[in-house]
Amino acid sequence: MKKKLSLSFILPVSIILFIFLVLKVWPFGDKTILVIDSNTQYVSFINYLKTCFFGTNDFKYTFSATLGQNFIPLLGYYLMSPFNLITIFFKPENIKMVLTIIILIKIGLCGVTMEYYLQKKYPDKKTLLFSLSYALMSYNIFYMYHLMWLDAIILFPLIILGIDYIFEDKKPTLYIFTLALSIIFNYYIGVIVCLGSLIYFIYKLILENKNKEIIKFKVFIKYSISSLLGGFLSMFILLPSFFGLSSSKAVFSLSNLKFDILIPYFNVIAKMFTAATGNGETWHGGPMIACGMVIFILLIMFFLNKKIPKRNKIINAILLFCLATTFVVKPLDLLFHGLNTPNCFDFRHAFIFVFFEIIIACNSYMNLNYNKDDLKKVSIIICLISIIIYLYKFKFNVSTYGLTILLSFIIMIIIIHFLKKNKNISKVLLIIAIADLTINTTSGILTNIMPDKQSNSEFKNYVIKVDNIIKTLKEKDNSLYRMEKTFDREENINKNMLSINDSMIFDYNGISHFDSVTNKEVEKLMEKLGFRRLLTRAYYNKNGSTITSDMLLSIKYILSKNEYKNYTKIIQEEDLAIYQNPYYLSFGYKIKNDNIDIESNNPFLNQNNIVKAFTGINEDIYEYSPYTISYENVKKTNDTYQTNSIGILKYKIKITSPDELYFYISPPSEIQTTYKKAKMYINDTYYDDYFTKYNWGVISLGKHQIGTTIELKFEFEEQLEIKDTYFYYENIDILEKHYQELSKNQIDFKKITSSKLEGKINLDKSSKIFLNIPYDEGWTLLVDGEKIKLNPILNTLTSFELPSGNHTLTLTYTPKYSTLGIIISLITLLFSILYIILCDKIWNIYTKYKEIFNYLIIGVLTTLVSLVSYFILSRLLDISNNIYFIIANTISWILSVTFAYFTNKKFVFESKTKGKNALKEAFKFVTSRLATFIIDLVIMFILVKLIKINNDYAKIIVQIIVLVLNYIFSKLLVFTNKEKNKIDKKA
């Protein structure tokens, strides 16, 4: 087996390396596969990991994301793969090379685990063809740059093997720990894996039709307990991540469950063809389920093979149809994505379909026989599918489509020839599969990766240059502050996008950030201050910001390639310079008032309101400038400007002040995904592109002589959507007054770690203190050793009150439920070890006390139904409102009672009542549960509304009480005249 496992690793890696050689991808050239999200996100996040081991950062909190955020959700989503530890020993500029090696290793290991699974299922058979197809499936190739997803793909065959072991009455060790690891390494794909394991378990349970019912029930119990143990083992990362996601983009809406058809069923079949993906389809295309034409042909032959029982064919056909339906029907697709529509990279559960596709094809291969009529049917089916694909113009890479069809018929000819001659066909099919998968892999890289034209050397030179100047700054000033930069990593590609997470590469406290778990409330605040926000991204403006927003957010330094007016240049290295903000304030300072209105879309008005409230000085920094607007070749309808050629939009401003003039045009919608590029001119001189995806914030128009007129002109095509336009002067003298007032009482903070700050402040009287750190229940503030309450301000930041005197402050962050998660994982680990060692003895004890154990198991499952439904509803509804609180609790009760009745009737009390007796029994069951529901409501009201216990904790306490009461009522009052099936004690 060792030789086969080695080949299953070497072969896919060698194929990819050969393609890299031809396409001049690193290590054979300067191109890179690390594009799109891996270039903008993962490179930065993984590099940041090093600072948690060797720097002052830790795994609890980070100030390198927006204004600061809980690091656990980001850690759990992006960084838990053990392969990432390899990167901490390399310099930042080499991170892309290291990650490329890691991707190759992961794809190779996909082949190894699949080969291991197949060898256990088909000992001594030649299965390399199928493990190769798994390793090089389109999912792995097109999503290889999502390297944190690949760990679960590696583990999935082992998880399935673990389920097989459970059916074979072996120890559940493999299943428990591989399932736990898949969730730990990436909880998002881990949840998909859990659903995949459930699908396989049901499939296997139906397929194994010869087993006695008691044995099937034993398997069900063993699988259920093992699944729960695997899930609870991951709670140390899953629990704090889940609660940390409450302010992220992952917000469920009932409107998401609208029944929509995403793609036609035939598209699913088309996507099984080699090179069945066109340009850009990784963003919003069909499922990535191609794994070679050999697999596709063997799959068809499976359903025509007379050696395979008809029942097996029907079960497998239903399975594939159901899996295909998850690509077609929106609510089913959403089920695999946490009930949220993916922003891009659709059908992320496609690897489950591919796995079943391959194991069915492997079964077909093991039962191959020569049947002339069947082989003709296969040829006709392939021909018809090919014609339909061509006629309906599905998105294929046209240059390889002909090769795909030709290859299909070559495969058929070879299969017919070798089967007819009764020769060994495995080596020939493997060679064809290698050629086929090479075409598919090359197509994937060419059409979806290479067009970005990223360069390893450009990235390396950029990182070295920027890292050097930031290190120079840190040697000069190692205090706690924020800094930002105004240039992108590669100016000719996606302006202001590639460098959005540079604060994590270079380990500085920045405000620009993009990830899938960021706090949306912080992003909204940044938008209110005039920064660009787009879905889960927040940007420091390419052309800078206002001095006031820099002051309020503690931005002390700006790294820029251009001269930065009003700031002092302190470092110059090559074409880069660092400028110091003369109006810098620390992370915390004294304010007069915390009741502030920032609901306007006008960032200048919002900034005025904030500083006036903070200082008590009723003078505006920003003064409105009137303007006139005109347009050419444009039709205006409400906020929309449309043109059939080149539209021109002109603003004219007569200068009435010598101060800096700013402008801002608010985007048209809350999520702001609408954008159209327009060329911006100032007095007919091209300045920049505006209304773009990444450049749509406050911009300075400079200082101008009083009495002159400046013209701001936009040239655009098609249409622009503009909600409001603002022109304001920045009065530096008034800004100075506000700054002097705020700078009088600042906290002198010192960073101990990223989750612990220490500071000092001296106050002459009791005062309110403002922290420009996002409000989070995880923060604990000790002042002179005593705990002080923190309050939200500006919807998302933090404030607190202090008495007069000299104070020492300690600010410590502990992610919500992280301690509870660790305790649950440790207890579960102990139970898992005991369960694995004693599982046979436990089963014997179970058969003796079957009713009690079944009730406890069903009780746990019922509790999960209640908890999950309640947690979802409590986040959909405002549970602070008593009506919605009761509605959420009522619906969760109805769902759990329905589940409990049928499961208790069948598995616990084994009631066989029918007709009127069954109705009476159901009535008594519902009545008893209604009684415990009333008890549930009363205790919940007391705990949540009167005692003020956290509603989640309260729900857990109440469920334990209700669990005990329900058993007593069911045993003594409901299932009193039941007839039971006798259990085969010998089983």
Name each region found by the language model.
Residues V22-K121, K126-P157, L181-F185, G280-T282, ...:
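Active-site lumenal/periplasmic loops and adjacent helix-entry segments of GT-C-fold
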Residues I16-L17, I103-Y117, K125-E208, F220-S247, ...:
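Membrane-embedded helix bundles of polyisoprenyl
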Residues I86-T87, V112, Y508-Q642, K650-S666, ...:
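A cross-kingdom signal targeting lumenal/periplasmic-facing segments of multi-pass membrane
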Residues P73, A433-S457, T472-D550, Y584-L585, ...:
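Extracytoplasmic/lumenal acceptor-recognition loop(s) of multi-pass membrane glycoenzymes
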Residues K2, F45, I621-W843:
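Active-site-proximal, structured, solvent-exposed surfaces of multi-pass membrane proteins
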Residues T40-L49, P82, V219-I221, G230-K306, ...:
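Periplasmic/ER-lumenal interhelical loops and adjacent helix-loop junctions
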Residues K170, I189, I314-T325, P331-L334, ...:
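Contiguous transmembrane helix-bundle modules in multi-pass membrane proteins
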Residues M1-V25, K218, K222, H417-L429, ...:
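Start-transfer (signal-anchor) and selected internal transmembrane alpha helices
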